[in-house]
UniProtKB/Swiss-Prot annotation:
The keyword Oxidoreductase does not apply. SUPFAM superfamilies: TPR-like. This is Pre-mRNA-processing factor 39. Belongs to the PRP39 family. GO terms for cellular component: commitment complex; spliceosomal complex; U1 snRNP; U2-type prespliceosome. HAT repeats lie at residues 158-191, 367-399. Keywords: mRNA processing, mRNA splicing, Nucleus, Repeat. The gene is prp39.
Amino acid sequence: MDYGDIYIAEETEWDKYNRQINKNPDDFDAWEGLVRASEHLEGGVGRNSSKQAINTLRSVYDRFLGKYPLLFGYWKKYADFEFFVAGAEASEHIYERGIAGIPHSVDLWTNYCAFKMETNGDANEVRELFMQGANMVGLDFLSHPFWDKYLEFEERQERPDNVFQLLERLIHIPLHQYARYFERFVQVSQSQPIQQLLPPDVLASIRADVTREPAKVVSAGSKQITVERGELEIEREMRARIYNIHLQIFQKVQLETAKRWTFESEIKRPYFHVKELDEAQLVNWRKYLDFEEVEGDFQRICHLYERCLITCALYDEFWFRYARWMSAQPDHLNDVSIIYERASCIFASISRPGIRVQYALFEESQGNIASAKAIYQSILTQLPGNLEAVLGWVGLERRNAPNYDLTNAHAVLRSIINEGKCNTGITEVLITEDIKLVWKIEGDIELARNMFLQNAPALLDCRHFWISFLRFELEQPLNSKNYTEHHARVSNVMEMIRNKTRLPPRTIMDLTKLYMEYLCHQSNDPSVLQEYLLIDRDVFGPFSVRESHWKKLDEGQDLKQVSTRLLSTNGHPGISVNEAKIKSGESPYEKYYRLQGVVETVTSGVAANGSS
């Protein structure tokens, strides 16, 4: 066969990164590589590039920012690209998408408003955008770039009145640049009419205080002449007092700024990134939130949470905290729903479904049953058999069942069990939960007992099943008339746990303690003390007297035979030696340690030395 005409295309950088992303959508480095590769298509995508290259870059930006909407720098790059290839309107559309995705970014609002200043001749539209930005980021401790741009805009418009109003607003906010803004405010206020410096009622009070003071008396020879104040002197005195009022505001803001500087100075990464934050950063955010919550200003608390959730967007604990704090505020339940929705739909990984389950519980609490059910179903679409979601859905069906009819709750459990998408451990837990519905909710004790007994042979490894089975029998009503029957049933379950199950030794020991407490505290038969002491010896005594463990070592043999053989072979009972297994490399102590609940790591010396 002639292979000369066959051409195998070499994988491009773009194809390589795209393939990596398709394989792992959470590979951030691959995403950044794909953006770079897209930007360099055809030697660099620009106005003269092919439509295919331009649309490819747009598509990559859309995909990337859809997954990581908090990357303000990439929104800026996307907007600049659109301005270059399609004009101001297309660029503005990207900025609008950007501030919808990250509405509390000082940098993005500053860039957007600067763009609007240069491309829009309607001052009112630009001013309106600045006002929106001020409401979103104006309280940010590091918002001075935005405020500087806002002041620059009003100066360009030759609106000193607006400049003064902005500065008057700024001197009340604890900011990194608070002192600079106060100095500028003092400077600008000197040229402002006195009527603009304070509210009319405050000015009237100051004027009354000034005019109430006695006039100056000047000596002229032997005469004393009273000099009445003129308006200029009154205004000069009023301005001095107004300055003192503003100075008090400055000192208060200075104190508030100093309080926050303790936390602000510890923020090393104020922007979003997928890299983990170190514990010191997380602790600082927790303490900062504690501080603002104690201060009690609703707007400042909300803004700090939003700042925190830019940096800590991938940490579920802060989403939980924000939602819980907001739920304690009067008339803000809709905001709680929005917080849960943002976390669930964008930021919290599906591999950690806890925030989604909490969202479903919140929706159910508000009567939104269909919404809650849809949340559980969406989790199970991505994580088939997720226990938290399944049990949440079952709980929803149980709580909202008409006339306590649990048909739907059982149907959810059994359909998921029968689908076979769960691992064995999850399936066993779901079977147990199905039985517990019959026991605890429907109250059909006989049916529940039969279900426990029927499933017991298949669930010998399931800790949850056997804990539930034992508790089921322990919690049945006990009185003097049914003691014998009650004890027999509890004892039967305990016998299966100790001799038939394959549970870890620690679990068996814990369940045995429960049974011993039952014997000691709920029995009215003195003879059970013999059983109590026998179990105590068998569970807590030295291994040489634990007869049940001998049986497990050599099942099916007579107890005396096992004891005699082990003693003669090993010098003491308790460890069964098999020469063939030793030669193959298996430690004779392995089973001993396993039954003790200890992992054995010793390798037989014969095998280790290579002897045969």
